[in-house]
Amino acid sequence: MDRRIYGGSAVIHLFLFFSVLIFSAASALSKNQSPSSGSGQINSNSVLVALLDSRYTELAELVEKALLLQTLEDAVGRHNITIFAPRNEALERDLDPEFKRFLLEPGNLKSLQTLLMFHIIPNRVGSNQWPSEESGRVKHHTLGNDQVRLSNGQGKKMVDLAEIIRPDDLTRPDGLIHGIERLLIPRSVQEDFNRRRSLQSISAVLPEGAPEVDPRTNRLKKPAAPVPAGSPPALPIQSAMAPGPSLAPAPAPGPGGKQHHFDGEAQVKDFIHTLLHYGGYNEMADILVNLTSLATEMGRLVSEGYVLTVLAPNDEAMAKLTTDQLSEPGAPEQIVYYHIIPEYQTEESMYNSVRRFGKVKFDTLRFPHKVAAKEADGSVKFGDGEKSAYLFDPDIYTDGRISVQGIDGVLFPQEEEVVESVKKPVKKIVQPRRGKLLEVACSMLGAFGKDTYLSKCR
């Protein structure tokens, strides 16, 4: 009996020991996994969910376009955040249209991300934590590694130059949102816009492709790995034989022989890929490849030794085309033919020509129509009146054979006025028949043998 009780107590002690050991291991494992689980998921009470469902619809739309949701989710998982949300009117009507178009271009995704991160502070700053008038301005670092200054003066809470109009508008456990009256623009984004508007950043620098977005994950694709040193060249030696942009404008060389030293199809494919990576010219590339066979025709011309300059309208200009303008048979081909110049021109060469001669007419592949160009507002303007277009994106692609210049409108040839010549009735002038009466009289007198009576009949 005693042995049974002793053995039973030993089993109970052993069971309690293993229970305590398993419980301590489970608690330690839960402690180790708690930070990762908090940073990996966002609950429905998050400040990000509140932003997407709030009155600040314009800001929420920009955050989605800038692909910042994953970045903000990671930031909320690590710490609280404070968002300064501009009102919708500040982004719809008060913002410069050119600046807004600059932000929405695919090639300026980094500038848009920097602008939005400038409105977010990686800690919690409520209205009760605002600096007083005596303390002056207090600097806070943003998620974009910039600094914003919080101040309080004349009863108004300010963040930089924007007034807080809705303090503590949305409050959540992981952050809060303040409503502000205007958009905050960091200095770096303003400088990028000024360089772009003055064409300084693209006048003498090779264009870089716009960031590529993976449609499956809605995230940026990783750039390709750099080519190792000593690897064979990516382009054939014939590409080095082509004249550079410094020689433009130059007449087209004569057709090549049967060897076809220039791979025109590869060059056309290269410039179409450049259009797609540059961003904003997808419609033009779609017409060249899918709607028409112009890409193949251009490749044959380049292979034979000819050079081409393409005036490529951007997507906004192509969207203004009506269905009637594209539904007629051969209409897309005729539109593109009018935008191809059979000579090599760069932005510099065309601008120098219009500055020197005032107005220059370039031949097009839509014979016999020509496209007129002149200098306007420090750039090159094509066409006249409402059907005009400005050279908007210079030197998108220049390889010595094909030059692509971006314009902000679709060009159409001027309609020829047919002047119908009206035939006026011609009045017939009856000439007098002189001497007929005298001739008849002489013949009658001659019949009677008395024509000698008149001296006129002799």
From Swiss-Prot:
Coiled-coil spans in chain: none
Keywords noted in UniProt: Glycoprotein, Proteoglycan, Repeat, Secreted, Signal
InterPro entries noted in UniProt: FAS1_dom_sf, FAS1_domain, FLA15/16/17/18
Subcellular location per the Swiss-Prot or TrEMBL entry: Secreted
Gene designation: FLA17
Family the entry assigns: Belongs to the fasciclin-like AGP family.
Role noted for this protein: May be a cell surface adhesion protein.
Residues bearing glycans: N80, N290
Matching Pfam families: Fasciclin
SUPFAM superfamilies attached to this UniProt entry: FAS1 domain
Gene source species: Arabidopsis thaliana
PROSITE patterns assigned to the protein according to its UniProt record, in alphabetical order: FAS1
Protein name: Fasciclin-like arabinogalactan protein 17
